[in-house]
Amino acid sequence: MTSTAQPAPPVPQTKAWIITGPTSGMGHVAALELAKHGTVVLVGRGKLAEVEAEINALPDGHAVSVVCDFADIHSVRRAAAQIVALGLPLAGVANNAGMMSTTDGRKSPHGWDLSFATNHLGPFAFTEALIPHLPDGANVVFTCSGVEDSECKPAVVSGFRGGRYISAETSARGEWKPGGSTKAGYDAYATSKQGNLATVFRLAREIPRLHFRAVEPGFNPGTNLGRDASPFLQFIAKRVLSPMAPMIKYWSTPKIAGRLIATTLTDTSDATGVYYDENGKLMQASKQVSDPVFSDRYVAETRELLATVPAEEEKRVPR
């Protein structure tokens, strides 16, 4: 008897979501949330293998890891190329990796200010390398910060004086507009996060087929952002301040912030060029970065600076 059974249809590939900085804090929470929506591409350093195993152990969980040092543009370009080579159906990118140095003078492999390179230059280069491979309607999310706004009262009280951008070149040298913060690392952090917002606003105008979104996760004392702070200060932040966060305005927790990042990345609306606060409500950026002339200049100068980093020479295969 001849069987009339039809072959089973191929199993469709699930969407793949890229998230950087997924090994701790809000990034870790976001990665676990994204696992509910498809494959998670974990990009960063440190405990990538542990998070990958954690997600793969979940029912229907699937994750892959790509090592990347966002302060090193060569590493960033390699990571983007590796992701493209995976052949996954990419659906969106969450640029969450970042740092806040509490000391001045730290440099990237290219000799650039470490915070500016890690928070802005690296994620910008990463995003630009992936854009041609993202489908229409894909979301690109940047974790930003209200400290870029010199009129943000909580940020000012904390010692920030807003973004101190002069040019991409001077920022890379660790030089900032006079009148900034007296606290080491604050101007670098605020200026780099202003760069993230400039990127969102400029690319939303430049590339309408994609959706660019910014998220202000609120003050999160439970993250590893200030990981070069003293062990005592890290203990106070995570064990004393973090539990209080839900009760204080403008504060948040890694769990709340991580879910917000995942929700913003997987949202199917057409929203682009938008900026969400820690509660997922629309918020206003600084007057400076909201000016298209300023954000256009910031992005143009970023591209010019990154163009000075030559492509890596292909490794010759011995014959």
Question: What residues fall within each predicted segment?
Answer:
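Generic structural signal for alpha-helix termini and adjacent loop/cap motifs
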Residues: 86, 267-269, 308-309
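Alpha-helical membrane-targeting segments
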Residues: 162-163, 171, 177-186, 219-256
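C-terminal helical subdomain
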Residues: 239-283, 292-297, 304
